[in-house]
Regions:
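Functional-site microenvironments in short loops/helix caps that host divalent-cation chemistry
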Residues: 1-17, 32, 48-206
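Acidic-aromatic/histidine active-site loop/patch
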Residues: 35
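Acyl/amide activation-and-transfer machinery of modular secondary-metabolite enzymes
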Residues: 20-23
């Protein structure tokens, strides 16, 4: 049994609560993010041409939008300091959609973690405050340090897709005013992301924060780590 949701210490949006109990079966989550090098292997192995790897809607999206690589990837012999940058093979892959993350996980023989599995790894035996990476937030030139529980890049590198739909927690009640209008009406057809990116403000870099994208969206430093059942 694990606790999901915001603990009540400090500011949180209403979609992060209330805190509740979640039953988790034995699982393992990778202690690092998937890299550009690994994604290159996926591409070279025909990942974007193999329908069996993709969800049905994902395959329709790939074919309909001519998707052959993560957003912003291109092959070019020339670049400038102000323009295109060479991809570092060992840097986390970013700007991918949920469809792509799920297809890669299937190809690799794993799956995406649930948001509550991710939370459990991020919090470890510590409180949410202790799990918060003090270096996170706008760290465009450096990677986040490893967490005490062994997870590398949990906070501050990229938003990480989970397989959990963006839905209300038990006993959730939308807040009054604009905040409730925003979060409550978007709880349909989207997936939860965790971890915060290099462009995320410090206050949003915490274990309980729930970002959410539609499965085809890949614009804000989105990446993944792998999980499996034990």
């Amino acid at each position: 049994i694990a606790l999901g949701g915001h603990s009540g210490a400090g500011f949180a949006f209403d979609n992060g609560g209330p805190q509740h109990r979640v039953l988790l079966e034995p699982f393992a989550v990778s202690n690092r993010l998937v890299t550009n090098r690994e994604w290159d292997e996926f591409v070279a192995d025909g990942g974007y041409q193999t329908a069996s790897l993709w969800l049905s809607d994902g395959w329709t999206w790939v074919k309909g939008c001519d998707v052959v690589s993560p957003l912003y990837w291109r092959r070019d012999d020339h670049f400038t300091l102000q323009g295109w940058q060479v991809r570092h093979p060992d840097a986390p892959v970013t700007h991918i959609s949920y469809f792509e993350a799920d297809a890669f996980a299937t190809w690799a023989g794993f799956r995406l973690p649930t948001e509550f599995e991710w939370d459990t790894i991020a919090r470890g035996q510590a409180s949410e405050t202790a799990a918060h990476d003090p270096e996170a937030g706008n760290q465009l030139d450096r990677a986040a340090p490893c967490q005490p529980t062994g997870g590398s890049g949990l906070f501050g590198d990229c938003w990480q897709f989970t397989r959990s739909g963006y839905l209300p927690y038990p006993r959730f009640k939308p807040a009054d005013g604009a905040v409730g209008e925003y979060y409550g009406k978007f709880m349909s057809g989207q997936f939860v992301l965790k971890g915060a990116s290099c462009a995320t403000v410090r206050g949003h870099s915490r274990a309980s924060y729930r970002n959410f994208f539609y499965p085809h969206q890949r614009w804000q430093f989105t990446g993944l780590r792998l999980a499996k059942d034990l």
